[in-house]
Structure formats: C-alpha cells, structure tokens
Swiss-Prot record:
InterPro entries: Ribosomal_uS4, Ribosomal_uS4_arc, Ribosomal_uS4_CS, Ribosomal_uS4_euk/arc, Ribosomal_uS4_N, S4_RNA-bd, S4_RNA-bd_sf. Residues 106-158 form the S4 RNA-binding domain. Part of the 30S ribosomal subunit. Contacts protein S5. The interaction surface between S4 and S5 is involved in control of translational fidelity. This is Small ribosomal subunit protein uS4. It comes from Pyrobaculum aerophilum (strain ATCC 51768 / DSM 7523 / JCM 9630 / CIP 104966 / NBRC 100827 / IM2). Keywords: Ribonucleoprotein, Ribosomal protein, RNA-binding, rRNA-binding. The lineage of its organism: Archaea, Thermoproteota, Thermoprotei, Thermoproteales, Thermoproteaceae. It comes from the Archaea. Pfam families: S4. PANTHER family: 30S 40S RIBOSOMAL PROTEIN, 40S RIBOSOMAL PROTEIN S9.
Length: 159
C-alpha cells in the first residue's frame, strides 16, 4: 500500500531566490496593488504558471522542425483558449516574451473589475468571495480562477 506523498507547493517555481531584493519587493508590491492580490503567494503562483509556459516554449524551440510540428499547435491553441496570447499562430519567440501581467489579467477578479461589474479591484474580490459572481451560470468563489476566453462573456452577477 505505501505511504502518501507529501503534496508539493505549487508556487515554489515562481518564488524568488532572494526575497529581500529591494527592486523585486517594490515590483511585487506594485503588482499586488494593481491586481488586488491578497498575498505574495498568489503572485508566485502566477509566476510559476508563466515559468511552466516559457519552459515548455523553450523546449519546443530546441526540437527539430519534425519533432516540434505535432506538439507546437496544441500548445499554442491551449494558450489562446486561456487568453494568454492574442493569436494561435504566433511565433514561439512571442510566447517567451510573455510576462506575469498576462497571467494576472486572466484572473476572475481582474476580469470582473475590467468589465465594470465592480467599483474597484478590491470590490471585485469581495463580490467573488461572497458568492455574488457566476461564470456560465455556476457560482465561483475563487478570485484566482483563470477565466478561459470562451467563458469571458458569460460572467454575471448573482443577486
């Protein structure tokens, strides 16, 4: 039967190596204020997801054209469906130039605020946590929910 494995933290890939770097602290503080993040772990999760995307793009770039062909298009389509890129036919070099803002812009909290359903980014977070926001008719209470492109226009308020 064996013992259970201890679950790994998903944000460790995005956690900075030197957390007391002044420039990094100021940048993180600015991003937390702009996107209404509650703690740095939410920012580190976004960085970890971005790191996964760029690592995958770099590995695809290192392959030969024959090896890359069947893997490249599904990867680009997935990024397009999630809304991280604007066009599924972009070059892999453009995917490597993504930054953490591309991930943070797809969070439900940010989209609710940008749609004008909330007065501020913090108000958007409160509406979501209190269960006043539905995505495609289903109540979502996680402000960090990454909204796919197809569900973006199906966000509504529940009274």
């Amino acid at each position: 039967m064996g013992g259970l494995k201890k679950p790994k933290k998903k944000y460790l890939a995005g956690k900075p190596k030197k957390i007391w770097n002044k420039q990094l602290l100021l940048e993180e503080l600015q991003l937390m204020g702009e996107y209404g993040l509650r703690n740095k772990k939410e920012l580190w999760l976004a960085r970890a997801r971005l790191k996964w995307i760029t690592r995958r793009a770099r590995s695809l770039l290192s392959m030969t054209a024959e090896e890359r062909a069947p893997l490249e298009m599904p990867f680009k389509e997935k990024l397009y469906k999630m809304g991280f890129i604007e066009d599924p036919n972009v070059q892999l070099d453009r995917i490597l130039s993504l930054d953490v803002r591309a991930i943070l812009e797809r969070r439900l909290q940010t989209i609710v605020y940008r749609m004008g359903l909330a007065k501020s980014i913090h108000h958007a977070r409160q509406l979501i946590v209190h269960g006043h926001v539905a995505v495609a008719g289903r109540r979502v209470t996680s402000p960090g929910f990454l909204v796919p492109r197809e569900l973006e226009d199906k966000i509504s308020l529940i009274q």
